[in-house]
């Protein structure tokens, strides 16, 4: 077999002469199309540095949020995972108010005064505004520990020699206004909870100044939306009492010259309003009074139920370190002042190194920093 000789041809050189017996080549065939990516394979877009990146659109942080919340309008609005009870709240408020404006307000405006529908409209819009702000506002969720911070805990678990070992619950103690306060470690969020912070089992988030999880508003009630929640229940009690009184007045005026049953037959919708308001007003008024006491004492529902600063659990009563010893000052501290910013960057983009929740490796060079003493020690 003859050795093949390869000769580099310059671009401007003429082609070599063909042998007499050789066949003249036909037109060159078009190049075969390059095979596309397999179905389901990621599409890569090249960059100037030579390192490819995923061609799909970048994800925002609300799309990979670890809690059980639902986000709307591109992450601008958030709600708890379950919204059935919240929908029932909207249905009761809207249906009762619409029936009142359709069947009672025209008669009362003609007979008594035009101020009745105006007052009802102002109360209704204020109630709906406070409800929507309570439901769609971040209650004060604290972001979870980063991968590197969580890797310190995983490394501590690996050093024990057992894959099923979990260190016991750890606490830290801090002094607040001369009172010792214990900070518990959250194994879900991988951090020590700040004072008055608790982990909501429904939303699966640590919420700052956690009051309670309210299914009626479809959200947790915490530091960033408690003022809206208090304004909602207070204004709702006024609206319910106002509609109840107006419906009773309407039926009383209709029953003049006839019996009360005849008045009920004339406006059956008013009967439905009367029943809804009668069974709702007691719980709403009681809830408003209870939270008025909490605001005046600078307490939360969680602290009151647990008896953190009282002798409800049989222990010694201690002084509330968050109280300012004045009702007016406590009310201003809870309800007034600037709204703290949200600590979760819902609209931010997921970074490439933290986009996927891959298994945590304690030997990752990016996590080579020594863990903080607060992460591995029981006390500071």
Swiss-Prot record:
Active site: 214
Gene deletion effect: Mice were born at the expected Mendelian ratio, develop normally and are fertile. Mice display increased resistance to infection by DNA viruses due to increased activation of the cGAS-STING pathway.
Localization: Golgi apparatus membrane
Residue numbers bearing the Phosphoserine modification: 19
Cytoplasmic side: 1-82, 133-227, 291-380
Lineage: Eukaryota, Metazoa, Chordata, Craniata, Vertebrata
Topology in the lipid bilayer: Multi-pass membrane protein
EC number: 2.3.1.225
UniProt organism field: Mus musculus (Mouse)
GO terms assigned for molecular function: palmitoyltransferase activity; protein-cysteine S-palmitoyltransferase activity
Note on domains (UniProt): The DHHC domain is required for palmitoyltransferase activity.
Entry function: Palmitoyltransferase that catalyzes the addition of palmitate onto various protein substrates, such as CGAS, HRAS and LCK. Palmitoylates HRAS and LCK. Acts as a negative regulator of the cGAS-STING pathway be mediating palmitoylation and inactivation of CGAS. May also have a palmitoyltransferase activity toward the beta-2 adrenergic receptor/ADRB2 and therefore regulate G protein-coupled receptor signaling.
Keyword Acyltransferase appears in the UniProt entry: yes
InterPro entries: Palmitoyltrfase_DHHC (IPR001594), PFA4/ZDH16/20/ERF2-like (IPR039859)
Protein name: Palmitoyltransferase ZDHHC18
Tissue occurrence: Ubiquitously expressed.
PANTHER family the record matches: PALMITOYLTRANSFERASE ZDHHC18, ZINC FINGER DHHC DOMAIN CONTAINING PROTEIN
Primary location class: Golgi
Lineage: superkingdom: Eukaryota
